[in-house]
């Protein structure tokens, strides 16, 4: 039940990836291209004045926006002002939309994938740390390998058309989401996750000196929760009944990299958040 922030340059098929995912699991897909002039109502929906032809009476009708879907691609979310960003992020957190004092509950499952372009920074509105924290994962999309790119060119410049089949239903996805939360976790695994997150905080107990030097802010409790949920999911996907510490370590990169805030010292030393997390994992 977490959302994902995808970071990658244009042309890496982020839209195709998400659209294909929505098709194979038979979910409603919606794409929102974020621009500087996008308004909150363009995402959540708006009220229109509607006239009843038979009675002549007029009333307001709520027209649902693109947020009323199961999988939403928020393309270049950092290109729109904070007010519009907040409209989507509120829906992500609360799973409902409020318009004109009326609450509209979103369909489940509800999953947002937001994208950011790491190259172009002019005219963008970076997401604040508090809003970045609402994304479970931060995934970096790399360029394809040479062989992968050859296969891509062959398939996309011919008449080849992939045939997609539904493999899951809404009900099955919700069942598996609940199943993950029923997976037992040993106390030492939870303690490891909490200790790992705690050591990202510059003022925490037992924080390494390099964290104090390179980070101005660490991850909050939500990171510990997502480390355990991610570890649970990884365990059952691999046919195991319970996660171990290695599962938590595998989740550390995508869960923590957008939750730690580097300072000027890290920038001066050319150290990224990913490198800091890797160094931290080597100390625990």
Enumerate the predicted regions with their spans.
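Conserved AAA+ ATPase small/helical "lid" subdomain
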Residues: 163-224
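C-terminal engagement/docking regions of AAA+ P-loop ATPases
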Residues: 202-284
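Conserved alpha-helical scaffold flanking the Walker A/P-loop in AAA+ ATPase domains
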Residues: 50-73
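Walker B catalytic acidic pair
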Residues: 8, 75-76, 87
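Canonical AAA+ ATPase core
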Residues: 50-55, 80, 84, 92-182, ...
């Amino acid at each position: 039940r977490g959302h994902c922030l995808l970071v990658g340059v244009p042309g890496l098929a982020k839209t195709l990836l998400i659209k294909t995912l929505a098709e194979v699991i038979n979910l409603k897909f919606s794409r929102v291209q974020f621009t500087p002039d996008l308004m909150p109502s363009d995402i959540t929906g708006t009220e229109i004045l509607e006239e009843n032809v038979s009675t002549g009476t007029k009333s307001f009708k709520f027209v649902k926006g693109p947020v009323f879907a199961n999988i939403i691609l928020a393309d270049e979310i950092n290109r729109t002002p904070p007010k519009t960003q907040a409209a989507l992020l509120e829906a992500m957190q609360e799973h409902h939309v409020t318009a004109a004092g009326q609450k509209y509950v979103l369909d489940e499952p509800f999953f947002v994938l937001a994208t950011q372009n790491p190259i172009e920074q002019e005219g963008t509105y970076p997401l604040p740390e508090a809003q970045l924290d609402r994304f479970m994962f931060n995934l970096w999309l790399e360029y394809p390998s040479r062989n992968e790119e050859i296969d891509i060119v062959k398939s996309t410049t011919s008449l080849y058309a992939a045939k997609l089949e539904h493999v899951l239903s809404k009900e099955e996805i919700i069942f598996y989401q609940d199943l993950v939360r029923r997976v037992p976790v040993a106390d030492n695994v939870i303690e490891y996750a909490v200790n790992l997150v705690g050591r990202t905080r510059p003022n925490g107990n037992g924080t390494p000196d390099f964290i104090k030097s390179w980070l101005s802010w660490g991850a909050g409790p939500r990171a510990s929760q997502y480390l355990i949920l991610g570890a649970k999911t990884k365990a059952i996907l691999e046919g195991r009944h319970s996660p171990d510490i290695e599962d938590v370590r595998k989740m550390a990169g995508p869960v923590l990299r957008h939750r730690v805030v580097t300072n000027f010292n890290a920038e001066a030393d050319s150290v990224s958040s990913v490198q800091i997390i890797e160094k931290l994992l080597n100390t625990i």
